[in-house]
Amino acid sequence: MKDSLKRRRYMIVRDQYEGFHKYEDAPAEVAFLKYRHRHMFKWTAKIEVFHDNRELEFYMVKDVIKKEIMPFVVMLDNLGSCEQQAERILDGLLNAYGPDRYYSVIVSEDGENDGEIEWNPDR
């Protein structure tokens, strides 16, 4: 028997975008990060869904992120840290789909180093 109260379901969508950033306060050991440099930023969004036939559709969610959210993520000359970019994506998801579901957004530099932010409606 399924204990549906204990099960949580999620959809996961991914994509990437080209961007530039710099870390102006970089420690001396990584001083090269103080200068503007390019990455392929890869993002992953994990979104809670409320039944096993998903009320959200992969393609539609990805389209909302690409068309309505990403312009605000990449509009800056310095995109900031992966965590700052993830925060902007999360803010867009909260605006699009509401605060009553769990979200996790991960942004990576070239698929190597990640920053993650979560929204947990249970806290």
Region roles according to the model:
Residues 1-123:
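Charge-rich, low-complexity N-terminal segments
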